[in-house]
Amino acid sequence: MNSAYFLGANSKDGFYSLYGGFCCAPGDYLTVIKGGPGTGKSGFMRKIGRAAEARGLDAEYILCSGDPDSLDGVYIPALHRGWVDGTAPHVIEPRRFGIDGDYVNLGSFYRFGLTAEHHNYVNQLYDRYRSEYAAAYGYLGACEKLRGAYIPRLFGAEECSSLRRRLRNILKRCRPRDGAAEAGAIHCRERFLHALSCKGELYLSGEAVKLCKLIYQLDDGLGGADAALKIAAEEAEAMGAAVIICRCPAAPERYDAVLIPGWSAGFVSDGYGIPGARHIR
């Protein structure tokens, strides 16, 4: 099964990265791609993914959180091979060069020889885009402060205890009857299925449905989805399940979704709007 997700987010505190968990399991080999804008990093990785698919192999596509039409990485689970854009804001280096990683420099195909006039123009563009990003992060930070001000804090110890009992009962019903609940290997245990991008707010709801036939949607009008999702993750792991934690891009300390592919069950916040999801209020 092919899949797509994000490993970076434009958050209230700036760029937030989960790339440290990409292609780092025993036996994995990661090629870090270097090169400036326009050198074809995304297209190169897309061709790799398509070639793998043409040979009947699954591919995991890492979408760029700023521009979801662009790729920042691709991983072929059957081959334990990954390729990643290792340039800012998610600078990555091979852990042990030549053993579990190497480089490809697409910058060598750049057409150089620009004039001083071009240099000045490019510098102006870089200054402007840094300024725009700083402003955007400031707005996101302000939004999070407002969220904290208007959402009531109703989830104390007693409420969380009641919520835990309810979620534990739901998870017991989701758990396979044959007891097949062992924690299997999951590539990128933490990821994002939600981004604040140049195309606006984007939820990869279809990716959650691919992995989990049964979806529970946590209505978040009172701000309890984060607490419920963290409890669901704790309880599922205590039962031996392999869990994927999806963080909120604006505030990565919050959970956005918890997926349990081995049980084909998932819990999501109400922003995903998945038709047919069972609501937990």
Predicted regions and their residues:
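A generic N-terminal leader/anchor concept
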Residues: 1-54
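N-terminal pre-Walker A segment at the start of P-loop NTPase domains
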Residues: 1-22, 161-207
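Conserved nucleotide-sensing/catalytic segment adjacent to the nucleotide-binding pocket
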Residues: 1-14, 49-116, 120-121, 234-281
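Extended intrinsically disordered terminal tails
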Residues: 19-20, 64, 148-150, 154-157, ...
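Generic recognition of cysteine residues
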Residues: 23-24, 64, 143, 160, ...
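Residue-level preference for short coil/turn positions at secondary-structure junctions
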Residues: 26-27, 211-212, 263
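Glycine-rich phosphate-binding P-loop
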Residues: 30-49, 201-236
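An accessory alpha-helical subdomain
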Residues: 121-177
